[in-house]
Regions:
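A residue-level marker of the well-folded mature domains of exported/periplasmic proteins
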Residues: 22-398
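Positively charged n-region of N-terminal signal peptides that target proteins for export
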Residues: 1-12
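C-terminal motif of bacterial Sec signal peptides marking the signal peptidase cleavage site
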Residues: 17-21
């Protein structure tokens, strides 16, 4: 059985819409996993004395709202431990995701962290790392045993696949529905996805559906509805068009969920609601914090958002770094799994408190990052478990 190093995710603090911080089961039927190379059983050579460790990062974008924050914390971690990070932006295009792993391996990276889109991409990614003796870990993602059993078996048996850091997207989706139905009193909810089949999107969608089912079971005389998704891609214009389509199809729409897409579809959704003159009348919730979130919560153009999880790839980086150093043993019958917590905010005060410790400064100092690099895998998981506004406030009290 897969070994799970679970971080506390949606605690009582989540109910208070704060003090709680992409992914989920992957898309449908995945491509069959290629057979492992016979060379993959050989261990990678540890870096020579004084040799600088180089870790590759395959990411959808290192420049958008979430991606740039991920890059900032990864660059800080690399500086703290004397390593180097090389980035390849993929746009979540399948061919570019798999090609990025080949590119990073060819560039001499001893390890790679990857945010893939679908499980199918992990077959070639893992095979490439096996063939090149390069360590691999996922961030914002985990391969689904249920949906992709062959690929799950492949990564589990790989001597170079260390594990995955991801969020519990089903619980995230359920909590956003709870906020809309219980706290906001909304009943006609329109849903905006980003890319069909994206692993994280599917997890959140399942959470939204479970949240609606739970509400309706408890309140049969006051049911809530959730529309079929309109897809926005990852652009602001796509978000605007999707929101306009939902409002046109159901004039009684009183809430919109911009499920993700790293902030851009949310911006378009807000613009569409503003253009329709329905700010406040239609409550908007989303995942992935945007820079002006505090102002949006203050003026009523947003009701709540989950996010603050940009340190997720930091923990994948630390897993790969320690595997390269020879400090972590990679199992060939399981993989490490760290579930990372979200932070939920529902007011400008909530966001201002968050921004003080996560935007105006990083949640970890250089000294703390260096100390983190020396943790065992068990203690690294414990460190992820306590990641929250309260934890950072305690460590960086002002």
């Amino acid at each position: 059985m897969k070994r799970k190093l679970l971080a506390t995710l949606l605690t009582a603090a989540m109910t208070a819409s704060l003090l709680a911080g992409c992914a989920a089961p992957a898309a449908g039927t995945a491509a069959a996993a290629p057979e492992a190379s016979s060379e993959a059983t050989e261990e990678a050579a540890a870096p020579a004395e004084g040799e600088k460790i180089k870790i590759g990062c395959s990411i959808w974008s290192s420049t958008d709202a979430l991606g740039s924050q991920c890059k900032q914390i990864l660059d800080a971690a690399a500086e703290a431990v004397g390593a180097e990070v090389q980035y390849v932006d993929t746009g979540f295009v399948a061919d570019q995701v798999t090609a990025s792993v080949e590119q990073l391996a060819a560039a001499g990276c001893q390890g790679i962290i990857i945010c893939n889109s679908a499980d199918s991409e992990m077959a070639l990614a893992t095979q490439t790392c096996n063939d090149n003796k390069v360590y691999l870990a996922q961030f914002f993602r985990v391969v689904s045993e249920e949906n992709s059993p062959e690929i799950y078996k492949m990564v589990k048996e790989s001597p170079y696949f260390i594990g995955a850091v991801h969020e519990d997207e089903i619980e995230n989706g359920k909590e956003l529905i709870r906020i809309l139905t219980e706290e906001q009193g909304r009943r006609n909810i329109g849903l905006i996805g980003w890319v069909q089949g994206d692993a994280t999107w599917l997890g959140r969608w399942e959470g939204y559906k479970q949240g609606i089912e739970a509400w309706n079971e408890a309140h049969p005389d006051d049911p809530a509805t959730l529309s079929e998704p309109q897809y926005a891609g990852t652009s602001s214009d796509g978000g605007r068009q999707a929101a306009e389509a939902l409002m046109s199809a159901d004039p009684d729409t009183d809430a919109l969920i911009a499920a993700g897409g790293n902030g851009n579809p949310l911006q378009g959704t807000i613009a569409a609601v503003e253009g329709a003159g329905k700010v406040g009348e239609i409550a908007i919730v989303s995942t992935d914090f945007i820079p002006e979130l505090g102002e949006r919560l203050a003026d009523g153009s947003m009701a709540a958002e989950s996010g603050g999880h940009y340190c997720d790839p930091l923990f994948a980086f630390m897993m790969v770094y320690n595997a390269i150093k020879g400090n972590y043993t990679v199992s060939t019958d399981s993989f490490e799994e760290i579930i990372f917590p979200y932070i939920f905010v529902a007011s400008k005060e909530d966001y201002d408190n968050y921004a003080q410790y996560f935007v105006d400064e990083l949640p970890y100092t250089q000294e703390e990052l260096k100390a983190m690099s020396e943790l065992s895998i068990e203690d690294l998981a414990k460190e992820a478990a306590i990641h929250s506004l309260a934890d950072v406030q305690k460590r960086h009290a002002k």
